[in-house]
Amino acid sequence: MSACQTPIIVALDFPTRDAALKLADQLDPKLCRVKVGKELFTSCAAEIVGTLRDKGFEVFLDLKFHDIPNTTAMAVKAAAEMGVWMVNVHCSGGLRMMAACREELDKRSGPQPLLIGVTVLTSMEREDLAGIGLDIEPQEQVLRLAALAEKAGMDGLVCSALEATALKTAHPSLQLVTPGIRPAGSAQDDQRRILTPRQALDAGSDYLVIGRPISQAADPAKALASVVAELA
């Protein structure tokens, strides 16, 4: 497998295997990793992960597990056995849930995926949190959940780039994965707390998840190359 040389993760947000692989075939695994989310995984199951790995890609399995500790830990174990590079769980599942996942991965003798916690979804603003009983700013909730994640031994966090600087300051050992990345001139779509790729790295993000600006471009390879050039 070719080691990726950039922090870019391209989101394969498609409903079918054929559509996802059509995009993957236009991308260079040395220039990006790929993310498999709920829609594609539900459609294709584990087979899509194996196919992408065979093409040389490191795979971020973005299923955001959230259940009782044992159930979530077993799901993370199954993801590791697929050979994924990164897997995530919701920090709001609590300390015991995250710690159970860490413990399960630490039992493995082979390669371990990065275990990443999801803090506050980048589509959520203060009024969204208020609707679920949290009358606080998203950034405050992110910091609360980050402290739990570090205590549980997580490798990193999914967070908005707008929270990255504060998180790196408070938790420098955690790797930060940032969705909602939009190259200059791109539409915001349904993401709200967003920055450009360069702004996100400068803020402290370690990995950048980019979807539609690459996946819906007329020339995805050219769009990817443009982002790589922006980061050079």
UniProtKB/Swiss-Prot annotation:
Its EC number is 4.1.1.23. It holds the Pfam family OMPdecase. Keywords: Decarboxylase, Lyase, Pyrimidine biosynthesis. The keyword Lyase applies. GO terms for molecular function: orotidine-5'-phosphate decarboxylase activity. InterPro entries: Aldolase_TIM (IPR013785), OMPdecase (IPR014732), OMPdecase_AS (IPR018089), OMPdecase_bac (IPR047596), OMPdeCOase_dom (IPR001754), RibuloseP-bd_barrel (IPR011060). The keyword Transmembrane does not apply. It catalyses: orotidine 5'-phosphate + H(+) = UMP + CO2. Pathway: Pyrimidine metabolism; UMP biosynthesis via de novo pathway; UMP from orotate: step 2/2. PANTHER family: OROTIDINE 5'-PHOSPHATE DECARBOXYLASE (PTHR32119:SF2). Homodimer. Belongs to the OMP decarboxylase family. Type 1 subfamily. This is Orotidine 5'-phosphate decarboxylase. The gene is pyrF.
